């Protein structure tokens, strides 16, 4: 079994530890965000995709205006972000906590604005800790493989839990405790069908998702490039109609994460996609 598959299969056991960590640090996390008026979420690569999810989740669950920024963008264009940063807390996302853009961006924010900085990463004692006020460390979620899987899913779980804590959604936080018990049997039941779909002769993947999971889905699309070297893109559900739809055909695998929102609008889109490709995986 490849290392990446080992880490992928371990993600739900790791999720239980991540949820335990959220409960253990619940009071500290709530206090850190209690008087925050706005927040900037920084990351690179996969973590930047997750920063987009984090910004949406914090806005939806806690009513905190949140802006996702690629850490490299911030470094290059730091003066342009002055008004965005000067009264905002900073949330850093990183697998290693050592990514140079993230560490340097944290240092600049602390030096220039005295920013309150929170970090979620999967390595203890990382360089970024020299600039942070609070760290949530998830060492059990650290991926050694180049392509992140377990790290991504656990960072997302931590972000969802953080948003629940900030918004006082105790029921949502409590529900996360059932992730491992639910997810492992569910995934094992789908494995044969997924293997069959993977072996079909598609050449490109399109991942559709809205709202909080959209950033996670963007990272999912990136995984096709990194792991199986297939061209891939993420789009918001209805937004795929505005241009990208013309490239969907029988050579394209479409994965759609359906939300609990307007079901008729989503069903109409999926019906149109099904006319273009039979390779349609709907996650509902």
Regions found by a protein language model. Give the residues of each.
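Active-site phosphate/pyrophosphate-binding segments
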Residues: 2-36, 134-138, 142-255, 263
């Amino acid at each position: 079994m490849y290392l990446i598959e080992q880490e992928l299969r371990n993600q739900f056991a790791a999720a239980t530890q991540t949820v335990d960590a959220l409960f253990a640090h619940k009071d500290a996390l709530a206090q850190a965000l209690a008087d925050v008026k706005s927040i900037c979420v920084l990351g690179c690569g996969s973590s930047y995709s997750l920063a987009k999810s984090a910004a949406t989740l914090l806005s939806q669950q806690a009513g905190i205006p949140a802006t996702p920024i690629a850490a490299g963008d911030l470094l290059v264009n730091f003066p342009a972000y002055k008004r965005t940063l000067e009264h905002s807390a900073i949330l850093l996302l990183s697998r290693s906590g050592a990514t140079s853009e993230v560490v340097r961006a944290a240092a600049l924010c602390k030096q220039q604005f005295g920013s309150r900085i929170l970090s979620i990463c999967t390595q203890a004692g990382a360089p970024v800790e020299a600039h942070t006020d609070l760290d949530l460390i998830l060492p059990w979620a650290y991926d050694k493989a180049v392509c992140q899987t377990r790290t991504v899913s656990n960072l997302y779980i931590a972000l969802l839990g953080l948003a629940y804590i900030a918004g006082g959604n105790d029921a949502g936080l409590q529900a996360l405790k059932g992730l491992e018990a639910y997810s492992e049997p569910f995934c094992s039941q789908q494995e044969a069908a997924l293997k069959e779909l993977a072996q079909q002769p598609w050449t490109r993947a399109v991942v559709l998702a809205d709202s909080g999971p959209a950033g996670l889905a963007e990272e999912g699309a990136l995984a096709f490039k990194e792991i199986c070297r297939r061209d891939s893109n993420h789009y918001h559900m209805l937004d795929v109609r505005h241009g990208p739809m013309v490239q969907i055909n029988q050579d394209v695998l479409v994965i759609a994460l359906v939300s609990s929102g307007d079901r008729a609008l989503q069903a109409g889109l999926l019906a149109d996609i099904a006319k273009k490709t039979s390779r349609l995986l709907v996650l509902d």
